[in-house]
Amino acid sequence: MGSVADDAEITGPLLAAAAGGGGDSAAAAGVERVPAWREQVTVRGIVVSAVLGVLFCLITHKLNLTVGVIPSLNVSAGLLGYFLVRSWTAVLGRLGFVIAPFTKQENTVIQTCVVACYGLAFSGGFGSYMLAMDQKTYELIGPDYPGNRAIDVMNPSLGWMIGFMFVVSFLGLFSLVALRKVMVIDYKLTYPSGTATAMLINSFHTTSGAELAEKQVSCLGKYLSISFFWNCFKWFFSGVGDSCGFDNFPSLGLAAFKNTFYFDFSPTYIGCGLICPHIVNCSTLLGAIISWGFLWPYISTKAGDWYPANLGSNDFKGLYGYKVFISVSVILGDGLYNLIKIIYATIKEVMNARSKQGRLPLVRVHDDDEGSKLSAEEKLRNDTFLKDRIPSWLAGSGYVGLAAISTATVPMIFPQVKWYLVLCAYVVAPLLAFCNSYGCGLTDWNLASTYGKIGLFIFASLVGRSGGVIAGLAACGVMMSIVSTAADLMQDFRTGYLTLSSPRSMFVSQLIGTTLGCIIAPLTFWLYWTAFDIGNPDGMFKAPYAVIYREMSILGVEGFSALPQHCLAICSVFFVAAILINLLRDVTPKSVSKFIPLPMAMAVPFYIGAYFAIDMFVGTVILFVWERVNRKESEDFAGAIASGLICGDGIWSVPSAILSIMRIDPPMCMYFKPSLTS
């Protein structure tokens, strides 16, 4: 990702070109009619959004419950939305029906609705704070573990999960909607992902862009089919349990396999490697080498000295405890640094905006000729964005009303959380939502999980041992939902601004998508919950962040007394190292900093294992070579191939879950063992 300044400089010309092709340039502004906001929200769009919402929720859950690494699927949502509606109109057109034209505004609304829907599969905590409350996570940590009490257990249930989603997921939409003009027009925040999505959608609705989109859809469908049938083929050899098949193929040897170094032929993680930046994939592999190549083998030699030698592989008093807490320390160090960095940048830019009397953040001073070329189109975008206002009284009363309902309802779901604590959270939340949304606009980083962890620690420590664990986890959910949805909404406003979409249609689309997500996300999670062994540390669906979040909540209640010997010292070293590495990335020149690893990406394999890092590295090597051979082709089709690989794997999870529910086991078990020696 380039710098924010770079984004601000290139955005205008590129969008002008894309819009010009579609008839949105200044010259064509009087010819093309921008649809009314009600025409942008269509029945077919809602149906397509619901279908894609199910697919992307399945994908998000699978990634959440396996490794916890979720790439951005916004481009995939826009591309598949374009394909499905185009197919819809083509079929009905051949049947003789009169079909309304498919506009870029409708495409934007669909993409917004899908992202709002599957975003709740992440911010809903189905692989983190919500799952951390269940019986299995409690038992995995151990009933005799300090602070881990049996009363702090709440198993997943569709009733309370859907109810909780409805009472907390809408507040973020109302918290900052009144500031949309300030953030998008006045401050001209770039929201790089939102800008990239707008450029993509604009390109779809040009002649050349439509041709490329058709090729991308064809490519996506091809690799989706390959991924689906490959997973089907793998299933026949996966046997009963989690120790058979290609997922446990010792491709680097049996010794490396014992330390989780193997290639498991996963299309999903290869696809993630194609989508994620090279530095993320390389950082993940480096973290795997440091932890599973050196650190864990070294600590394991201290069995009987630092910790009892006869403990199980998942006992927190042994090596397992080091794995979890060192991962937590790196994640917290990285999150704390970036939180302080974003808040500092936010305060600095706001103060500069005030002191310079109208010179706003991220405004590039264009030459007069360039400014005159873009001014007419920018005026059209501004007029469109400001035409369909969302009344401030609606935003304010909506937030207050929803906060009142949530304040009364959340304690009914979680009795450990008192109403006045929920109220305090909703008083502070808009400020945190602004910080996160502004920071996301500057850097493209959504730090919702970091704000959630802060709420977790504060509430867990305030409530104490009498229910603090559940209270902290629930508070994490409240904060994450508000902060995450507010940033997503503002990013979607940026996309809508650049595609001449009405802010009112974008807001309605977010409401519809959130409503769908409150139902679809729990239902798709329930499919996994009933079909697979979720939370088994030796299985496929490890749910790594469930254990991490519960341990953080226990840490907020108990302090550091529960850590194994020398664990606090090692955690402190890694916590400081995460901060220093981030600082080094910021103070060194870009030519150097691009090679410095990301601590957050390094932390993930510390707990999960090295296998997925190898898969992602395979993806990044493929992309690297492809970029050297044909950069234009890689830019056009790498995302489509990655999306196909990920989507095919996600679709396979449905028949796989059905087979599991019906107790139909694979017919063969393929496994490996050392050769017999004399």
UniProtKB/Swiss-Prot annotation:
NCBIfam families: OPT_sfam. The chain crosses the membrane at residues 41-61, 65-85, 113-133, 158-178, 226-246, 279-299, 324-344, 394-414, 419-439, 467-487, 512-532, 561-581, 606-626, 641-661. It comes from Oryza sativa subsp. japonica (Rice). Pfam families: OPT (PF03169). This is Probable metal-nicotianamine transporter YSL6. InterPro entries: OPT, YSL-like. One of its GO terms (cellular component) is vacuolar membrane. GO terms for molecular function: oligopeptide transmembrane transporter activity. It is found in: Membrane. Expressed in roots and leaves. Belongs to the YSL (TC 2.A.67.2) family. Keywords: Membrane, Transmembrane, Transmembrane helix, Transport. It is a multi-pass membrane protein. May be involved in the transport of nicotianamine-chelated metals. It comes from the Eukaryota.
